[in-house]
Amino acid sequence: MAYPTPQVTKATGAVFIPEIWSDEVIAAYKQNLVMANLVSKMSFKGKKGDTLHIPKPTRGTASLKAASTAVTLIADTETEVLVVVNQHFEYSRFIEDIVEVQALSSMRRFYTADAGYSLGKQVDTSIINLGSGLQGGSGTTAYNKAVLAGDGATPYVAGSTAGTALTDAGIRKMIQTLDDADVPMDGRSIVLPPVGRNVMMGIARFTEQSFVGDVGSGNTIHNGRIGDVYGMMVYVSTNAATPSTATDRIGLMFHKEAFVFAEQLGVRSQTQYKQDFLATLYTADTLYGVKELRDEAGVAFAMLG
């Protein structure tokens, strides 16, 4: 018997091959991650269970050894951080055949890019929101342990104390807060809302050639990049938190061990043809957990939005 025609082949059905969608989604997802690349990341992929146990040993202290005496034993009880992996987010589209047939090929590129953007934004938002618990904070949108960006020390009180513009003195004071807590200098970052970047570009110390030494196209005035500030890379994210006072925005200065991101299921892309609807269901999803790891390793600061 002759082979039936027409056939659905790999060429004619290429738009339904999951691997193509998946590759494009993962690329877009990685492009839109800011916070996830700046914190401690632990892979939970392929492992069963819903909770990750991370040992958190207490630092010991040295004791003076006197002659003819026994050594001093350290009897600390070690603790652990529990990361519950319960953040399961998905992005789905239902694409009818008539649209698939008549639409430009760019439609798929838009959906995959949009899926990557949406999932990446959600991951970053989950991590950024952990900043409300730094320095013993309540973990709410009140940000009761945040400081004012202007001086880096005055407590922020949502609803009664407005955020202030970021200053060089404020940055240096927050650096001292981390230094006083013995937070390692290597691995620190600053994440700002766009308004924070706007303010920093107006601070001569961070932009003008006489201070930073950059000339030509390497100067911040020409390229808009802040780059390295006192040994910390500066990143801008529109996902920066908005506290309960909606006119303010929250920035973070932190070490990578302030937060942990545990990923059990990386971005997965799937398609399923629904013949009864003559349409294709497309879904991208991810499963992860986030947690504050070291409370003293970061500072949240409030600025005017």
Set out the residue ranges of the language-model regions.
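N-terminal "assembly arms/tails" that initiate or stabilize quaternary assembly
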Residues: M1-V81, E296-M303
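Generic, well-ordered alpha-helical segments
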Residues: G46, K65, I74-A75, V85-Q87, ...
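Alpha-helical scaffold segments that mediate packing/assembly in large oligomeric complexes
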Residues: I98-T177, F301-G305
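Extended oligomerization regions of viral-like shell subunits
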Residues: K48, L52-K56, A169-E263
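A conserved acidic, glycine/proline-rich C-terminal tail/linker
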Residues: A262-T271
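Extended, compositionally biased alpha-helical segments that mediate assembly or anchoring
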Residues: Q270-G305
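Structured, hydrophobic secondary-structure cores that serve as assembly/anchoring elements
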Residues: A28, H53, R59, V71, ...
